[in-house]
C-alpha cells in the first residue's frame, strides 16, 4: 500500500507523456506534409516556363530526341511516362500547374531531360537557370531567386497560357500518330531485341493507345 500512490503517479505521468509525444508526432507529420505540398507547388511554379518550352520542343523535335536516345541508350523513366498518360486525360480547362504540383515526378524528369545536350538551350528559351526540385524549397536555398523581378515576370507570362497549353500538350502529340515516316524510321532503326520490346510496349499500352502521346510512345518503342 505504501507504493500504490507512487505507482499510480508514475503511470499517470507516463500516460501524459505518451499523449504529449503522440500529439507532437501528429503535428510534426502534418507540418511535414504541409511543407511538402508547399514545396511541390513552389517547384511547379518555378519550373512552369521550362515545362512548356520542353513540351513544345518535344513535339517539334521528336526525331532528334529518339535518335539521341537510341545512340546513347537512354530510357524514358516510367514515372514520367505515367504522368503523360495522366496528362492527356486532363480537361482542357484543367490547371496544369496545380496538377504538376500534385503528381509530377520532378526528380525523374530532371534526370531524363538533363541528359540531352540541348538542355541548356531549353533553359535559355524559358529564361530559366535550372530545374527546381521540391527539396530546394524545403531547404529554403532558392528563396532569394524566387523574389527577383525576372522570375515574377516569367510567372505571370506562363500562368496566362497554362489552360491552353494543357489541351494542346496532349493533342499536338496525338496528331503525330499520322506521321508514318517517323514510325517507319523508328522500326527500321531498331534491332530485333528492340522490336520485341516494342511489341511488349504496344500490348501494355493498348488500352490507352488512342490517348497516349505518340511521341512518347515512339520513345518507348526504342528505349524500353
Curated annotation (Swiss-Prot):
Chief localisation class: secreted
GO annotation, cellular component aspect: cell periphery; extracellular region; fungal-type cell wall; side of membrane
Induction, per UniProt: Expression is up-regulated by the MCM1 alpha cell-type-specific transcription factor.
UniProt KW keywords: Cell wall, Glycoprotein, GPI-anchor, Lipoprotein, Membrane, Secreted, Signal
Residues of the propeptide: 204-224
GO terms of biological process kind: response to pheromone triggering conjugation with cellular fusion
Lipid-bearing positions (GPI-anchor amidated asparagine): 203
Location of this chain's protein in the cell: Secreted, Cell wall; Membrane
Residues annotated as glycosylated: 148, 181, 191
Post-translational modification: The GPI-anchor is attached to the protein in the endoplasmic reticulum and serves to target the protein to the cell surface. There, the glucosamine-inositol phospholipid moiety is cleaved off and the GPI-modified mannoprotein is covalently attached via its lipidless GPI glycan remnant to the 1,6-beta-glucan of the outer cell wall layer.
Keyword Cell inner membrane: no
Signal peptide: 1-25
Database matches in Pfam families: SRP1_TIP1
Keyword Acetylation set for record: no
UniProt membrane topology term: Lipid-anchor; GPI-anchor
Its job: MATalpha-specific protein that interferes with a-factor, the pheromone secreted by MATa cells. Contributes to mating efficiency. Acts to bind and sequester a-factor rather than to degrade it, and promotes the efficient mating of MATalpha cells by keeping the a-factor concentration at the plasma membrane within the narrow range needed for accurate pheromone gradient detection.
Stated family: Belongs to the SRP1/TIP1 family.
Protein name (Swiss-Prot/TrEMBL): A-factor barrier protein 1
Amino acid at each position: 500500500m505504501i507504493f500504490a500512490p507512487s505507482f499510480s503517479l508514475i503511470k499517470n505521468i507516463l500516460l501524459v507523456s505518451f499523449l504529449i509525444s503522440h500529439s507532437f508526432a501528429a503535428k510534426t507529420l502534418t507540418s511535414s506534409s504541409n511543407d511538402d505540398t508547399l514545396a511541390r507547388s513552389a517547384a511547379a511554379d518555378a519550373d512552369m516556363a521550362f515545362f512548356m518550352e520542353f513540351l513544345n520542343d518535344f513535339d517539334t523535335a521528336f526525331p532528334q530526341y529518339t535518335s539521341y536516345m537510341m545512340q546513347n541508350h537512354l530510357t524514358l523513366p516510367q514515372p514520367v511516362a505515367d504522368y503523360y498518360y495522366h496528362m492527356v486525360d486532363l480537361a482542357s480547362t484543367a490547371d496544369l500547374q496545380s496538377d504538376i504540383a500534385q503528381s509530377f515526378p520532378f526528380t525523374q524528369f530532371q534526370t531524363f531531360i538533363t541528359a540531352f545536350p540541348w538542355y541548356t538551350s531549353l533553359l535559355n528559351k524559358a529564361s530559366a537557370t535550372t530545374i527546381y526540385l521540391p527539396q530546394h524549397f524545403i531547404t529554403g536555398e532558392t528563396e532569394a531567386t524566387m523574389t527577383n523581378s525576372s522570375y515574377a515576370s516569367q510567372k505571370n507570362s506562363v500562368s496566362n497560357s497554362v489552360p491552353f497549353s494543357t489541351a494542346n500538350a496532349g493533342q499536338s502529340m496525338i496528331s503525330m500518330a499520322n506521321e508514318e515516316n517517323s514510325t517507319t524510321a523508328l522500326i527500321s532503326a531498331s534491332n530485333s531485341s528492340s522490336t520485341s520490346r516494342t511489341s511488349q510496349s504496344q500490348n501494355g499500352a493498348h488500352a490507352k493507345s488512342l490517348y497516349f502521346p505518340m511521341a512518347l510512345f515512339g520513345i518507348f518503342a526504342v528505349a524500353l
